[in-house]
Amino acid sequence: MATSLTQNFSKEEFKKNVISNCKSLYRKNIEEANDQEVFQAVSYAVKDIIIDKWIATHKQYEKDDPKMVYYMSMEFLMGRALGNNMINLCAYDEIKEALDELGLDINVIEDQEPDAALGNGGLGRLAACFMDSLATLEYPAYGCGIRYKYGMFKQEIKDGYQVEVPDNWLKDGNPFEIKRSEYRYEVKFGGYVRSYRDEKTGRDMFVQEDYRSVIAVPYDIPVLGYGNNTVNSLRIWDAEPVNTFNLNSFDKGDYQKAIEEENLAKNIVEVLYPNDNNYAGKELRLKQQYFFVSASVQRAVDRYKSMNNGDVKNIYKKVTFQLNDTHPTVAVAELMRILMDENGLEWDEAWDITTKTVAYTNHTIMAEALEKWPIELFSRLLPRIYQIVEEINRRFVEEIKAKYPGNQDKVRKMAIIYDGQVKMANLAIVAGYSVNGVAKLHTEILKKQELRDFYEMMPEKFNNKTNGITQRRFLKHANPLLSDWITDKIGDGWVTDLSQLEKLMLYVDDPKAQQDFMQIKYKNKVRLAKYIKENNGIDVDPNSIFDVQVKRLHEYKRQLLNILHVMYLYNQIKRNPDYDMVPRTFIFGAKAAAGYKIAKQTIKLINNVANVINNDASIKGKIKVVFIENYRVSNGEIIFAAADVSEQISTASKEASGTGNMKFMLNGAITLGTMDGANVEIVNEVGAENAQIFGLSSDEVIRFENEGGYDPMEIFNNDQEIRDVLMELINGKYSPEDTEMFRDIYNSLLNNDGGRRADTYFILKDFRSYAEAQRKIDERYRDTNGWAKTVMTNTAKAGKFSSDRTIEEYATEIWKLTKTPVEM
């Protein structure tokens, strides 16, 4: 079990450290320092404790030379580091006590830390959970990503609209990162490739010339295992110019030219997912991807060579690159380039090594999210990489033709380069030795639908790894009241073995345990109500049902279905003032991509509906609607702990897995959802009676998509109550100043638009089923004991959904890693 730091943690030493950090960082005594300065001083003191373990970990890896996974991801949504590090050091209470003695409040200090703006949604949070589990399970790993200056954006809600402002999370510095200038690498863009024959070897040689380049400089952030000595590194790359400043140009008055290289570097790391509605944005995204991938692969190869006498031929025995979605797929061609152009390997040998080294996780069923690049852009920006991809494609197309003679349809679907585009998912599948989906249903859909041709040709590559979450952050840190109660009941083994929660099943019928559990939920609701009052100025009743949907805003996630139902419910109450219902607080939180128009309109709709409902005294507070601004990991932790109902209402077959569903479940909420993604497995664990399922099945959705037969207009014409709700989108009820404000939403539900079907995501089709499920939730909540038993069962059955289980499966079945305990 976890080794507490208590034995070698000196409270006095720690206090001294904090005081001296304040002096050396700010020339201030602790009493004079402001909250942000105190946060920095405390963080440096905690980092001091981490450093020895961090050094020991890397010494251990040098000594044992274990196989290492490089987890490559565009996003790492880490959340705040201070509290998480204190928990994984098993020193939270000791440090809190030391700070108390200095007259400092740990909660105030933790609140000073901005969330690291390195990700946006589930993809990035999964990567963060995986890093936590890898270190806790003592597996050697690097996370590889980009050190974004502003991340995605900070969301502000102004007059109901989402406004994107830069998220300047680094403005006060990140106390936990360490710059590693000694591992800098050049990354080249553009130019052309000159080839010549080497007379000595008779080989064709390729040299990129006339290119522009930037220098990638890594910053390492410690990722601590819980209760052990392992500290792995999240390595995020910053871009610096090759030549900082051109004095010559400056002196000649060409100020633009003087800082040109600086700007090239700066742009690459400015933001996550620059808007790719335009050519420049597309180019910048591809630059970002190649930038961090090239630097990471160069470093991994160099590290391997330094430990293996300069030889690269067995690198696959010690290195594996896991591609988290399609963004890092250029790693395939970059590894080929390094093996051939820099290490003199022939094609066949390089390809053999590459295909034993790279593995791919597919995260989406949505075709538009499988990246494709115009040949013109790809070949101009990455000329040598494009040549290599072209050759991979040529050889693979020959394989297809040999296996399926005369079948041009197979070529069309499977070729890496086709129709003027480079298809990154196809490259990842062809080169990867493993292709995994992230929930059982998702993997089955990939095999039978989206990637069927690949599955038929290379079935041995495909496997499923259902996602998970780290209980250290999402229960132990996010919900200390519940965490302590669980430990009191079953011991603290669950912190590193979540399957132990099953022991709580002994208590689900115990009236006293039920009362305690619901009292904890109530206190967490009071905490969230306070947050809402402070941030939204809205009073919400902790005795109401907290019905929550927090996640990225996308049409398939159907925040629209949720708010249309709220409008419907409001109509019911207005028609019948004595309408009998348990008061309900509908809580939303979501960022919409800056260029995603209808998603942003949905946010405006939610806020306008909230404005009308929250200010209507006649409904006596039966409904409140809250949109939480700038949803992120840190406020997510407060939200998950307080939810009664977890809205997981994506159109069946569209959500690969989802992980928010697991966070709510772990904290004792009931899933109101479709049979989609990991919801299917949640229902398998808790039993259908402990969830509230509605809507079309995945098979039904796919059938409608393939064969047609659904007309939303029919529902509109025949269902008066649904028609009333839709008419309110265009009659000014929620936008008196502009009746056309929500016309696009109305049209998307009822009118075909070019190639797009009306109601693409079956909102009206599922509406009645959803409304009925919501009515049942109301009914169930009134049965106090039945409800308590259901939500306690959800917590007790959450064991499967730990990222520790997921990582154990990746490590043993895909990566073939060996646990490497760190001795100190």
Residue ranges and their predicted role:
Residues 1-824:
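A conserved ligand/cofactor-binding region detector
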